């Protein structure tokens, strides 16, 4: 199964979309505010829609503070887990690297990541990408937490419902809409807006770790979005994808006010 990660960051400025295709690996790249990023493809595990929210490493974190989505009624367990994992790494990147990135090192066999004895993930860079992520996070300072925003979650859900049932992979909806138009349907006033999408990854932590390692993406644009200090709000939606089992759309903003 393929897993595609796409990155889109809207900062006040011009949008210049670039696209490329390589076999069955569809890749979109966008240049916004002077930055360029692209998508990547890896093998992923089977679809497991919603798991328990139990965290065996909870003792290492101030969960009541970091779990900003725990009381909202419009997110599933996995969607809340995505926000929790993003807040963990934003609050203490070095600790996150030690707990969740470094332990992956021994599981690489050349370009394959061994999920278990019988399941492996084909990567583009192998252990080198995880090591680069570890070193980068160790050098970062913490940034402010993300808080759930209903309008962003609704915008993300619209995109999941739209392209998921069609088996598509894109930031662009079937109606030609993009993250900005979807967000503006449910709110306004944002200062900046970003979006990450994953396909085929089925747990909150795996979604965030995959985006952080950003295997095959030279500028690690997905990691940059997660760690961008300017973002304070997020909306997450997961759902079925006819080709890859599950997909997750994560929208980010600051200054956004839901309708």
Enumerate the language-model features and the residues they cover.
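Bacterial Sec-dependent N-terminal signal peptides
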Residues: 1-24
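Sec-dependent signal peptide cleavage junction
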Residues: 18-72, 103-111, 115-116, 122, ...
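Short, well-ordered surface patches within globular domains
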Residues: 72-186, 223, 229
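Short, flexible segments with low predicted structural confidence
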Residues: 53-57, 61-62, 127-128, 135, ...
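A structural boundary/capping signal
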Residues: 23-48, 59-60, 79, 83, ...
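A well-ordered secondary-structure block
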Residues: 151-257
């Amino acid at each position: 199964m393929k897993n595609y990660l796409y990155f889109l960051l809207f900062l006040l400025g011009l949008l210049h979309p670039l696209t490329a295709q390589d076999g069955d690996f569809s890749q979109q790249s966008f240049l916004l505010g002077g930055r360029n990023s692209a998508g990547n493809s890896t093998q992923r595990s089977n679809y497991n829609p919603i798991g328990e929210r139990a965290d065996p490493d909870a003792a290492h974190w101030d969960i009541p503070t970091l779990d900003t989505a725990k009381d909202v009624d419009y997110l599933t367990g996995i969607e809340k887990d995505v926000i929790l994992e993003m807040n963990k790494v934003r609050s203490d990147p070095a600790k996150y690297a030690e707990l969740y990135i470094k332990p992956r090192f021994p599981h690489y066999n050349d370009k394959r990541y061994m999920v278990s004895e019988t399941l492996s993930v084909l990567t583009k860079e192998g252990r080198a990408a995880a090591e680069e992520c570890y070193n980068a996070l160790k050098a970062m300072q913490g940034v402010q937490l993300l808080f759930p925003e209903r309008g962003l979650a609704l915008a993300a859900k619209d995109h999941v419902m739209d392209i998921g049932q069609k088996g598509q992979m894109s930031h662009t909806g079937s109606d030609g809409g993009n993250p900005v138009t979807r967000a503006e349907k449910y709110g306004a006033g944002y200062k900046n807006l970003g979006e990450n999408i994953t396909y085929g990854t089925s747990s909150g932590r795996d979604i965030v770790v995959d985006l952080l390692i950003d295997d095959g993406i030279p500028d690690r644009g997905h990691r940059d979005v997660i760690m961008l200090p300017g973002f304070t709000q997020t909306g997450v939606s997961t759902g079925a994808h006819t080709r890859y089992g599950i997909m997750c759309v994560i929208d980010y903003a600051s200054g956004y006010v839901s309708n």
